[in-house]
C-alpha cells in the first residue's frame, strides 16, 4: 500500500510501470479524491470535484485506490492547479479560501479545524480536525440547532456515499461512523501537544459508541445509514473498480 501524498500526476508512479516491469504497489491512498471532496463541501460546488475525478492519473488494471474521507493525517489541498483553473477558480486564492473555511477564519463557517504546518511566508498550510467537526456537527451540537445537526449528518453520509461508490477499497476512519468530534486531550501530553493532528487521533469513546443502538441519537443516525450503504456496496457489482471516469450529471 502506498501512502503517498503527492501531486495527482505523481501517484501513478507508485503503482509501477506495468504488471511485470517495475511492479510496485497494488493499492494507493486516493488523497486527491479526498481533497476534492473537502473542496466540494466548502464551496457547495462540485465543479472542481468533477474536473479532478476526470483527470485522476491512469493506473494499472492490477492496481486500485484506497478511497477515504478522513484518516490519521492532516488534509492537504493537493489538487492540480490546472484543474482549479478549469473549474473557474484561481489556485492561490482558492486554496486560501478552503483553508480559511475549515479553520474558522471564514465568516459563517461551522467548521472547527486548525491549520497544520502553516508557512507564515506563503500562507500555505494543511488542515487538522475530525470529520464531524469539520462538517459542522460540533458547532451544531453546541448551539442545539436541529437543522444544522441534520445538515452535518447528511454531509457525513454524502461524503461516505462517494467513497463507497467509487472504484477501489473504501476506508472508514475510526470514530467517523459515530460522528466523533475533535478532542483536546492531546494538549495535556507534552510529547504531542505541539502537533494538532492529535485532535483527530483521540482514544475511541466506547460509551459514545453504545449510543449507536439508541434510536434517534446522532450516533445511531450516522451508523445505521452507513451500515445500510456498506451492505448495498457489497451486493452491487457495478461499484467495483472498472476505472470508469464517466460522470453522470
Predicted regions and their residues:
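Active-site and adjacent substrate-binding regions of carbohydrate-active enzymes
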Residues: 1-249
Amino acid at each position: 500500500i502506498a501512502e503517498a501524498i503527492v501531486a495527482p500526476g505523481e501517484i501513478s508512479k507508485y503503482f509501477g510501470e506495468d504488471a511485470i516491469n517495475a511492479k510496485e504497489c497494488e493499492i494507493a491512498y486516493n488523497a486527491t479524491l479526498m481533497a476534492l471532496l473537502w473542496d466540494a463541501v466548502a464551496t457547495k460546488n462540485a465543479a472542481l470535484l468533477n474536473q479532478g475525478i476526470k483527470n485522476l492519473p491512469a493506473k494499472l488494471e492490477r492496481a486500485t485506490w484506497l478511497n477515504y474521507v478522513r484518516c490519521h493525517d492532516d488534509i492537504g489541498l493537493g489538487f492540480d492547479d490546472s484543474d482549479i483553473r478549469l473549474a473557474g477558480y484561481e489556485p492561490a486564492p482558492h486554496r486560501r479560501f478552503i483553508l480559511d473555511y475549515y479553520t474558522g477564519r471564514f465568516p459563517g463557517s461551522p467548521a472547527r479545524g486548525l491549520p497544520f504546518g502553516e508557512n507564515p511566508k506563503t500562507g500555505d498550510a494543511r488542515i487538522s480536525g475530525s470529520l464531524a467537526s469539520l462538517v459542522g456537527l460540533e458547532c451544531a451540537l453546541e448551539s442545539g440547532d436541529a437543522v444544522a445537526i441534520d445538515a452535518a449528518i447528511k454531509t457525513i453520509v454524502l461524503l461516505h456515499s462517494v467513497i463507497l461508490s467509487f472504484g477501489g477499497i473504501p476506508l472508514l476512519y475510526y470514530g467517523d461512523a459515530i460522528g466523533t468530534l475533535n478532542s483536546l486531550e492531546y494538549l495535556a501530553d507534552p510529547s504531542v501537544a505541539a502537533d494538532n493532528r492529535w485532535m483527530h487521533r483521540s482514544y475511541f469513546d466506547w460509551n459514545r459508541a453504545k449510543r449507536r443502538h439508541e434510536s434517534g441519537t446522532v450516533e445511531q443516525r450516522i451508523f445505521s445509514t452507513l451500515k445500510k450503504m456498506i451492505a448495498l456496496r457489497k451486493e452491487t457489482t457495478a461499484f467495483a473498480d472498472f476505472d470508469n471516469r464517466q460522470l453522470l450529471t
